[in-house]
């Protein structure tokens, strides 16, 4: 992906901070101060994220930086607040939720962010808010590192996502399933407004506030719709399109979110709230990455369907503004074709296909059946597929090693080679194109776990190293080959949940 366009570098103390979300009526948020953490220290930081806001990266070791992004120091211009929202969790209406441990510091200039030209800075784990419910308002080091690494890894993969500026830690004890230490992750996005933000006002029958929120979102992030015949239908159509395309990207790279509740769905079509996520390893379409998801609602195979369900939930809330059921349904009908078109486009690229053929869908389906039958490693398969040479059986061997049922793979490979013969590209050109879209490196859970365990002993070097590797997922990086390896046996026992 393209590097961010640089703009004037500024020091933290000179950063012009505002808060456009605070322009909404007070019912939409609660103004409050973060709860300080004792003796904070820097765990990790992203230079590429800092570049988006023109922040001088040499500031990261300063006391002011660490204190600011722990919530112990409030910069000039900040109007800290936590937003209210509601949502459906695992398909069930959960009522009011809100930022239970996230506090928005404000927004800063970010010229590459179209159309707002700004990024919000949000501290996750900054203390109790009125929306904390039974929680303590804190995040733990483990989950904060996971969110930081995955945010930056997804950005490097070219997938729409919130960004992570840094993680700070403290020795303060936090009780979860076991004793852990507290941390704060600083997240960045043009907006953290969610589907659940709209659900909150719809289900509380406060349509004036619903309209106020919709008008704010359109003015700030979709200004092209202000003059549309029906701005709210245009908004729903665009959000539905972005959501479908985002999830197509997830499926193509084997990413599983784990908690696709409506309160975790971004109104900008960004991957939001990294919790019990995972990247597909041994392929299993029904894989559940969140061990608390007993029914498999958010399994890999169901993500496209759930994305559509969530868009319909959003459509329900916008119906009073759109004013017509048929118009609302017309906006939502874009989901299925938009998803199918984007997924097919991504799959053709992954297979090195430059043209569209009528039977491509059958080729894709046959491939996933073969991957399922042998539980072949998702990332390794697509990366190695670029090495295949038409008519050279020996070039298949590294691929065949990934399959238990090699005969089934051979049958598919024959279909694939016949399909490649319809293309006007040679083996070397195809390999280059495929390696540019099929990552060699993804954030496997075991890699994150190794980095986390070292960080829990105050060794943050592996977090920094893993970030360095994941920022260039398509490069060969021969010196980092071990980060592309199959997971060790002990990784089979790793479980991730909503606990964070």
Curated annotation (Swiss-Prot):
Residues annotated to bind Mg(2+): 264, 273
GO molecular function: AMPylase activity; ATP binding; magnesium ion binding
Database matches in InterPro entries: SelO (IPR003846)
Enzyme class: transferase
Record bears the keyword Disulfide bond: no
Cofactor: Mg(2+); Mn(2+)
EC number(s) stated in the UniProt entry for this protein: 2.7.7.-, 2.7.7.108
Disulfide bridge positions per record: none
Residue sites binding ATP per the record: 98, 100-101, 124, 136-137, 187, 194, 273
Catalytic residue positions: 263 (proton acceptor)
Catalytic reactions on record: L-seryl-[protein] + ATP = 3-O-(5'-adenylyl)-L-seryl-[protein] + diphosphate; L-threonyl-[protein] + ATP = 3-O-(5'-adenylyl)-L-threonyl-[protein] + diphosphate; L-tyrosyl-[protein] + ATP = O-(5'-adenylyl)-L-tyrosyl-[protein] + diphosphate; L-histidyl-[protein] + UTP = N(tele)-(5'-uridylyl)-L-histidyl-[protein] + diphosphate
UniProt entry keywords in alphabetical sequence: ATP-binding, Magnesium, Manganese, Metal-binding, Nucleotide-binding, Nucleotidyltransferase, Transferase
PANTHER family: PROTEIN ADENYLYLTRANSFERASE SELO, MITOCHONDRIAL
Similarity comment: Belongs to the SELO family.
Role noted for this protein: Nucleotidyltransferase involved in the post-translational modification of proteins. It can catalyze the addition of adenosine monophosphate (AMP) or uridine monophosphate (UMP) to a protein, resulting in modifications known as AMPylation and UMPylation.
HAMAP family listed in its UniProt record: YdiU_SelO (MF_00692)
Protein name: Protein nucleotidyltransferase YdiU
Annotated source species: Herminiimonas arsenicoxydans
Lineage of the organism: Bacteria, Pseudomonadati, Pseudomonadota, Betaproteobacteria, Burkholderiales
